[in-house]
């Protein structure tokens, strides 16, 4: 799934903005696509528009109030009039087929619940226009709208059928990482509830992540791993960006009693000494949530929005991250923002859009 065009009306600072996300030389839908501009010109706003519209259509965000992006203020959504967001979304044949298979498996799994209603098969349209008008959205037909809900079908199926995890590799979705991300950033599919409870304090967030990683680590050590080694996949991605670093063995916290995954540090190795994830550098903390979620949620064929891609990264590391994106999310379309000349220099000008305003610096 890729977005070729976007149109924003009365959305935050933009009264009227049209964007084309295709490579201006080849005409192909671009990835990565870089948005640059001075502070306050609306880079984050563009990413929010894409994430909000797609996640509402995909039923992963239930309302404007639930949209989880730090700095998003739902009470001002219609401050400048009724917002309209329109996206032109492209699908491959395999994505369409995978979504149809997931929808059918979900329908058949309901044990009679709702079986009196006919099965509505997602459409097979290679191009779908998704339109969000206020909080109402549409996609031509109901069947076309369901083309965006493959991961939602699979997530519901996964509650009762663990084999549904194999579906995610082929299903498109939308994921975003804001400019305030760190180890406490909430899991993508959970987000915040109606009262904004998706975010937690740093210590709680780190403890939650450490527990999840240690469960993977101990399952691997105990030989209880399934057909896919998620921990090894995560370490491989981590080493791709942070050359010379690796994962170490769990280190006990010595709290006494029978240890649980909460009672171990998750260790990393810099080639000289070891350290716990809580001791990560700011640059590592900005990248690790992307790597972890990419493995855990199996990013494929999806839209991934990464605000301030160079966040807390030395220029060579920022470039290493950009170069690693196709490996982090195969067949994904990445939307990036940056203030870094090092990042802008390695992305084609034909795949870069500069928002107007301010002084030209990139």
PLM features: residue spans?
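Pre-Walker A-like glycine/lysine-rich segment at the N-terminus of P-loop NTPase domains
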Residues: 1-55, 326
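Coupling/switch segment of ABC-type P-loop NTPase heads
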Residues: 109-242
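Conserved P-loop NTP-binding catalytic core
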Residues: 49-124
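Extended helical coiled-coil dimerization/tether regions that scaffold
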Residues: 2, 181-280, 285, 292-302, ...
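Walker B catalytic acidic pair
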Residues: 307-309
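C-terminal lobe/lid and adjacent interdomain/linker elements of RecA-like ASCE P-loop ATPase modules
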Residues: 1, 316-362
């Amino acid at each position: 799934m890729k977005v070729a065009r976007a149109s924003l009306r009365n959305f935050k600072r933009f009264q009227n903005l049209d964007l084309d996300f295709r490579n201006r030389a080849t005409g192909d839908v671009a990835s990565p696509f870089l948005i640059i501009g001075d502070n306050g010109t609306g880079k984050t706003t563009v990413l929010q528009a894409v994430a909000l519209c797609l996640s509402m259509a995909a039923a992963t965000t239930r309302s404007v109030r639930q949209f989880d992006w730090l700095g998003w203020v739902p009470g001002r959504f219609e401050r400048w009039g009724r917002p309209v967001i329109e996206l032109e979304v492209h699908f491959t044949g395999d994505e369409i087929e995978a979504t149809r298979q997931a929808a059918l498996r979900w329908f058949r799994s309901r044990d009679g619940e709702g079986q009196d209603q006919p099965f509505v098969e997602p459409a097979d349209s290679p191009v779908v226009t998704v339109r969000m008008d206020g909080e109402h959205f549409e996609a031509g037909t109901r069947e076309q709208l369901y083309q965006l809900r493959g991961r939602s079908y699979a997530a519901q199926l996964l509650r009762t059928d663990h084999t549904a995890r194999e579906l995610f590799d082929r299903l498109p979705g939308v994921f975003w990482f804001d400019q305030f991300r760190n180890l406490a950033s909430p899991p993508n599919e959970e987000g915040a509830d109606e009262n904004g409870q998706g975010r937690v304090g740093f210590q709680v967030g780190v403890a939650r992540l450490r527990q999840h990683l240690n469960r993977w680590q101990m399952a691997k050590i105990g030989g209880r791993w399934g057909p896919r080694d998620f921990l090894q996949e995560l370490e491989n991605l981590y080493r791709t960006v942070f050359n010379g670093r690796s994962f170490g063995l769990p280190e006990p916290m010595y709290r006494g009693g029978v240890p649980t995954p909460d009672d171990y540090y998750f260790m990393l190795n810099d080639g000289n000494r070891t350290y716990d994830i809580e001791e990560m550098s700011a640059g590592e903390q900005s990248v690790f949530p992307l790597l972890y979620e990419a493995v855990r949620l199996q990013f494929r064929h999806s839209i991934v929005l990464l605000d301030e891609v160079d966040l807390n990264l030395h220029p060579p590391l920022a470039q290493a991250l950009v170069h690693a994106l196709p490996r982090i999310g195969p067949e994904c379309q990445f939307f990036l923002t940056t203030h870094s000349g090092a990042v802008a220099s390695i992305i084609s000008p034909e795949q870069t859009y500069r928002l107007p305003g301010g002084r030209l610096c990139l």
